[in-house]
Amino acid sequence: PIGEETIKNLKLLFQKDTKEWNKPKYEIARASISSKKLDVEEIASMTLPSVVKLEGDSGLGSGFFINNEGLIVTNMHVVAGGDKEFTISGDDGLKDQGEVIYVDSKLDFALIQANNIKNSKALPLCFSKYPRPGQNVIALGSPLGLAGTVTRGIVSAVRQPSSDLEDVVPYYVTLIQTDAAISPGNSGGPLVNSNGEVVGVNTWSLPGDEGRAQNLNFAISIVDILRSLNSENPGKAENTNSCGNIVEKENIFKFW
């Protein structure tokens, strides 16, 4: 069974929010994806410019851009300290302030709007399908404030919360289990597949100790987040991959 301390920590993540938030309207744009599977170095170089460190008075975390107008996804527990304004910084010298505009406590995610960034590089999203066990993934973020950190692993499982967590994590939350390391400060960063598409938002890890399993890390599915936002999927198109993005025959990789 899962320990009492872990359940206590999860209750802090998936807590009820008494504030009413106006749900923003978000339309998904298809990305153009190379037909070639990319190695970790390629994915990191293309993804890191879209990953940011978030700093508030109560702590820090990670996030990433989902559109070209400075809209950032992160975890709710990153912004749960009461801060409304956050400092946004990127691995490439990017610096700005941003404001929390939406919080979903049931799925532990939040949206932050950057004040001045209007040409952000959005990451492609795997919006139409959950990943499969065994797929390669990398986690990006700022563990302990160390911006631009990349860890690699596989999807260990895609699961609904176990019976141990049924009173803590909502039943409709899909957890992506991975052995890619997720550490404090990594929360809110993207978990991406070998095409560089976001499959989840890094959320928490199960602390390991003597007699317990190691490398149990979890992300919230981007599919569930987009569904919660009532995001509008683009219409049907030819040459799309399982994530819904357009596959290019050439060995290129570009964002919309």
Listing of model-derived features with the role each one plays in the protein:
Residues 57, 75-77, 142-143, 203-204:
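Short, surface-exposed secondary-structure boundary micro-motifs
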Residues 2-65, 76, 83-84, 109, ...:
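N-terminal activation segment of mature serine protease catalytic domains
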Residues 36-41, 50-69, 94-97, 122-124, ...:
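A conserved glycine-rich beta-strand in the N-terminal activation segment of trypsin-fold
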Residues 54, 84-91, 137-141:
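Short conserved beta-strand and strand-loop elements enriched in small hydrophobics
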Residues 42-43, 99-101, 114-147, 183:
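Active-site substrate-binding loop(s) of clan PA
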Residues 5, 60, 67-108, 114-119:
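Catalytic-histidine neighborhood of serine endopeptidases
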Residues 48-50, 114-124, 150-230:
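Active-site region of chymotrypsin-like
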